[in-house]
């Protein structure tokens, strides 16, 4: 590669890289602030998925541009080359966004002694038509805040346990979903006072809790906690206020407290 071609290719691929980076940054805002707000981007593993898909895409597009760019090519050849590169890169972006969209949290469910975060793929979708009408559709942005109701009878309990053995815990069974606000007393009984477990934490964990409480404008004496889990993580703790509202979360294994 001669110097003239190298400089030309470097300039064009540099512009392409900046444009790709700008698009990726805009999409990152949608992903991490709308589909995966804190702490779900860590609990659901979206950071790894985003950087795997878009990191490769942002690098490969400009690299192809660098390889194919040549000032000696005719305009028609350049148009064909760049159209092909844009098509490949755009297809990868769309594929990546589609998979990230499917893996986003669509339901946050109180289940016995924990809060479980679910993506669409975690849920027994065959039951969705039998769920309460307001929960049959997943929101495009945000998620449903739910709880699991009690069994109606022994037969329903038996069926639910059988589904759990098939890989779908009770939080993943839409027929058992009710509004989170309808089960506040049950949640209150399961939640543990954070102040009573605070001294069991190590120094770093205590500082993380203090920082989280400060950001949530919550006093330690008024805070409660439950384990926050997903199919990808079991090492988080959700912090609740005295009204059992979810306020924030900390990366601490609450099952050990």
From Swiss-Prot:
Report the InterPro entries cross-referenced here: TfpX/TfpZ-like
Alphabetized, the UniProt keywords read:
Fimbrium biogenesis
Extract the NCBIfam families matched here: TfpZ (NF041437)
Protein's name in the database: Fimbrial assembly protein, serogroup I
Q: Which organism is it from?
A: Dichelobacter nodosus (Bacteroides nodosus)
User: Which gene is annotated as encoding this protein in its UniProt record?
Assistant: fimB
